[in-house]
Amino acid sequence: MEVLKLCLLLTRKKQFEVELIPEKIGARRPWKLETSSTATEAVVSVVTYLEATSGNARDAKEAGIYIRVYGAGWMIPEFVRMLMLHYSKHGECILQEIGAAFRGEHATDLLLICDGKETVRAHKLVLAAASPLIRMILEETPVLDGVTTVYFPEVQVSYFRLLLDFLYSGQVYVRSVEEYHHLQDLLALLQIKASIWKNSDGSDAGEPRKSEPLVDINRNTEGITGSSVVHQHPSRRRRSKSQDSLSGDSASGGGGTGSQAGTPKKVSVKSERHSAGSSVDGDGDRDREENLEYLDEVEEAIIKSNNNHPLHPHQHHLVAGSGGHHLHHHHHHHHRQLHQISRHDGDDDAGGGSGNDGASEGGSGESGRAGSVAGESAGDRPTPTNLSSGGGGAGSGRRSGSGEPTEPAEDDEDYELDVEDRGGDGDEAAGEGETRSRRSDPSANRRRSSSDPVNLSIVKQQQDVDSDDANIDVETIGTATTKTLLPPRYLDPFRTKRKAAAYYIHPADAEALKPMDHEGLLHNSPDNYVVTPHRKRRPGFHNSPAQNPPFVPSYLDDLRARSKCFLSAPPTYLPEKYLSVLTRWNLKTHLRVHTGEKPFACRLCVAMFKQKAHLLKHLCSVHRNIINAPEAGGRYTCCFCSLVFETLQELVRHLSGHHNNLLLSKNLHE
């Protein structure tokens, strides 16, 4: 007789389909027997079929196609194969449904009345499964209607809600050890087994360990069945790579004048990130994190937009050739400046808080830092130096209320000297006494009047060895040497960190290379700038050149005197065709620090900026409610036209290209 195999399939309609397939292919056609009743009838049908085909039931039994389902029939294991239907996420789905029913109070059949007649609704099945006391009450109490009421007159409703959260979700956060002890007493009252919420070694979970103040509710150890209660909410903070670097910068050198690094700063993106990173309070922390993520997105979009559509296209070409090293150096510092676009060039106290200057960072209260070395790359100095002094000697004093102490340097290479002008006639003792009074009285540090122009120059005299570089005032700058005022990299523009071999060039290329003319570039700049203090609000001030001669730094003579390189070989210079474009643009941008010129203006407020990237960052952060309104559905809307963009980078590229004229302050009244 042919050996037949039986396949029993369970469908959603609970019907059994029996398929008999001969072992030998082609010996007999498959037979399908269907039934909509029970498995017993299916077995009977199979037996009937086998008796009809083989002649008796004994041969059918020997063939091994009898099965037994819930006691109906026989089963021979070596011939019968059972199929199993596995529900992979059964427990997870059940917990989700039970939790949703508890939160929405759906199909609740248990009413708990606590102290103060406050009620809590729950489900009998969940509480009876965990609490023997609730199970006993439900078994002994006749159910008159669908809802059973249980009174707990001495239990506060807040503790019962914590207990229900623990029973429904398997974990709960408590605010203090006292709450934990109350919850522990409630668990004991309901006769809930200690193995559910205690460790197996019998240690008291209510006493937190000093080395482990946070206990995870889902932590499983050896011999533990269940979970433990957490007594303190863990603080979760996410800090991006840019946030870590910014917080490090602000902690190292971003402090206010005459104070420690922990002093609160003026309004700036850096200080906001640093303060938001240390906040751990609920919804406020989440809002700050969302704002920080948005600001990171804005900064990244502006950087990508500048990389795709650079303000200076020539910088993408000036990498190869004999001057490639120096060009890479300029490009590196220009890229570092793009990362510093959090320093706004607006005003500290502009209306609506929208005109925040990056120069106001550090807590000094001034509208901006002025000064640096002419011809220095603008990207090489993210925090320019302000050197302002008169023609007086070392013993000359300064005007009352016109100066501020020096801020500490942000890095090892950048010296930030913020010293105002001083009168030509004065006594040395009076100047020292006034300086001491200014150090003792912080309220005397006020912003210098913007109506008096200032000539910037560098005073080079002898300085004592014991002078403190971190607290340079009028007296110390009057006696300071050139080495203290200017780092060596200013006096030697060809100093690099490469090997000495980089300074040697082929003799055939010496004729094509030519040193740059610093003085010629300065006097032949597009505008003969007049050096004045930083201005407020809108530009438009003009001073007479006779009253204010152009800024000519005195270190140019030292540059000419030190023209010879420290090596015997001639120094390597950039070709003039590169310097004529690259250096002049950097010089023009840098001179805005001294002149106070802000060619970029915001049309939505009174803020003005020295660079376009600062204005774009201002539009995307301060006026976020306009470009990223809630009704826009997460998309970005142009504030000058009705175009809508999917990403922030597309909007920044659109503003920088199509509406470039609207960003200029000279077209403000058009």
Curated annotation (Swiss-Prot):
Q: What does this protein do?
A: Transcription factor required for terminalia development. Negative regulator of the JAK/STAT pathway: represses JAK/STAT-dependent expression of ventral veins lacking (vvl) in the posterior spiracles.
Q: Where is the BTB domain?
A: 108-176
Domain of life per record = Eukaryota
| Major location category of this protein | nucleus
Enumerate the residue ranges of region (Disordered). 200-288, 307-470
An example molecular function term from Gene Ontology annotations: DNA-binding transcription factor activity
Q: Where are the zinc fingers (C2H2-type)?
A: 586-594, 600-623, 636-658
Recorded protein name is Transcription factor Ken 2
Organism ancestry: Eukaryota, Metazoa, Ecdysozoa, Arthropoda, Hexapoda
Biased composition (Basic residues) is annotated at 325-338
What is one GO biological process annotated to this record? male genitalia development
Q: Where in the cell is it found?
A: Nucleus
Q: Where is the composition biased (Gly residues)?
A: 351-368, 389-400
Here the segments flagged for biased composition (Polar residues) are 218-230, 451-464
User: Coding gene?
Assistant: ken2
